[in-house]
């Protein structure tokens, strides 16, 4: 009798463990959302398996990769654990392709300031258009995927962060990009890992943006922490954006790492996951109006370069 009881107990325990493992399994599906000449654009959807059977609509994280508009992958292995973390937290995660317009351009064509400025603007415009098409695809499948189209959060790393921020900037200024999306659509929030906004002259916001979470190192020589301007065209980084958000009294979470370079384009996906969840739960889903700034200081870093020129940024991005 005792042996039988122990056997039953062990069987129940194994069944319980198997149930937990099954519940935590992440389902991944891949879809083609656009074909543009030679480019077939796809997106990957990640959702926790036990949520597929639910009836409640879920918020979405729409992620776009980094790579200097020259390369990068939506399924970069370094991103996957971040996607799974968010999926287990109750989000549907969508990682999307976009056309990387700088990959086939001869570097000699944008080695000077004007050439670089023009090529970069074209690459950003192209990436943002594709990001909008991915957004539309999600909205069109919102019922089938059981997601809430009013709770789509844009997220990106480096070039992807520029793309996500630029998309929000275009919506707020009611440009032609906004016409590609449903009327009155806006993202519920934006999470930017070392991003910036591209604008001719100082950025102006006709409408206030959604809550923004900005990660940036003040020693970043790839994407400007504050700004990099060529005549009128400029890249306006997280620090400048945050100053504007303060003036507009718009909710934000700004994470500054002093003495740190472009590693903030990926490290928060591992090191700041719970900060990200706090932003999502409070400022995005909870609609709390908060102005949060966190400054990370490393006492071992006392002297570092942060006053980069536009030539420095071009040199770094041509590697």
Feature locations, PLM:
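N-terminal cap/lid segment of alpha/beta-hydrolase-fold proteins
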Residues: 23-56
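Short beta-strand element of the alpha/beta-hydrolase
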Residues: 56-68
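Serine-hydrolase catalytic-loop signature spanning alpha/beta hydrolases and amidase-signature enzymes
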Residues: 68-71, 93, 137
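Short amphipathic alpha-helix adjacent to the substrate-entry channel of hydrolases
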Residues: 74-96, 103-105
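Alpha/beta-hydrolase active-site loop
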Residues: 113-144, 237
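Primarily recognizes the serine-hydrolase "nucleophile elbow" in alpha/beta-hydrolase
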Residues: 136-208
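The feature captures the conserved acid-bearing segment of alpha/beta-hydrolase catalytic domains
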Residues: 178-249
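C-terminal catalytic histidine-bearing segment of alpha/beta-hydrolase fold enzymes
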Residues: 246-319
């Amino acid at each position: 009798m005792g042996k039988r009881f122990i056997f039953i107990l062990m069987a129940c325990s194994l069944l319980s463990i198997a149930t937990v493992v099954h519940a935590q399994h992440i389902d991944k599906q891949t879809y083609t959302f656009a074909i543009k000449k030679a480019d077939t654009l796809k997106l990957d959807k990640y959702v926790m398996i036990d949520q597929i059977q639910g009836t409640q609509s879920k918020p979405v994280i729409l992620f776009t990769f980094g790579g200097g508009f020259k390369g990068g992958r939506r399924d970069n292995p370094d991103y996957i654990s971040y996607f799974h973390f968010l999926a287990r937290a109750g989000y549907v995660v969508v990682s999307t392709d976009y056309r990387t317009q700088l990959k086939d351009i001869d570097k000699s064509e944008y080695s000077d300031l004007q050439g670089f400025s023009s090529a970069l603007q074209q690459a950003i415009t192209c990436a943002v258009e594709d990001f909008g098409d991915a957004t539309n695809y999600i909205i069109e499948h919102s019922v089938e995927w059981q997601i809430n189209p009013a709770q789509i959060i844009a997220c990106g790393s480096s070039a992807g962060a520029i793309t996500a921020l630029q998309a929000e900037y275009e919506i707020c200024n009611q440009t032609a990009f906004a016409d590609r999306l449903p009327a009155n659509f806006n993202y519920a929030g934006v999470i930017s890992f070392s991003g910036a906004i591209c604008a001719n002259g100082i950025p102006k916001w006709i409408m206030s943006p959604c809550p923004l979470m900005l990660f940036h190192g003040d020693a970043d020589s790839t994407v400007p922490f504050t700004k990099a301007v060529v005549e009128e065209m400029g890249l306006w980084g997280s620090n400048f954006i945050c100053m504007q958000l303060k003036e507009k009294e718009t909710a934000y979470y700004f994470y500054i790492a002093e003495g740190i370079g472009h590693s903030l384009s990926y490290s928060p996906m591992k090191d700041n996951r719970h900060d990200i969840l706090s932003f999502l739960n409070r400022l995005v889903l909870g609609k709390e109006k908060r102005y949060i700034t966190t400054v990370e200081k490393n006492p071992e870093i006392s002297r570092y370069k942060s006053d980069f020129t536009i030539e420095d940024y071009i040199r770094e991005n041509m590697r």
